[in-house]
């Protein structure tokens, strides 16, 4: 009788552990979502929007830089950057193309920051294009700032989501984390650098009587270019 009771207890325990395991895993051994269901598609779409907006911002920076390069006689550098802009436009939403252009923009602006604009800027070319350059750079700064804030929010949400989603969705969420982490870490320094670069251009423009766009005009242009 005692032996039968022991067997009965073991069977009950085995069934209990099977039920507990089933609560945590589905029949395919995948972890179930806990609590509120994660909108993986929503996270992915927000990630894609971030990349598009950063790409738009960086293209705007690059176009503004090209105008300055041409005004200081850096024709070869301007042509090379134009090709990079065309490549980025052909690959809309491509994270690698965006990263490459971010790097090129940072290098180009760093090179131009070493130049004495008063001595090397062609004043006639500056009168024609400097206002537009300042506008494009201002647009990029605004779009970068918005993207950096949104990326920080998305990074926190996607990291929390990774603890809840199934194994089959984990890879997609990790991709979102990588995108948002890149933007949250790399884009604020770019925006700050370009803002300082723009300040130097504005100072030169004011010194030489060249009109500059208003803050309202820059914001209006940025709003028209931002993807929501």
Give the location of each predicted region.
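Immediate post-signal-peptide N-terminus of mature secreted/exported proteins
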Residues: 24-94, 224-228
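N-terminal export/membrane-targeting signals
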Residues: 1-25
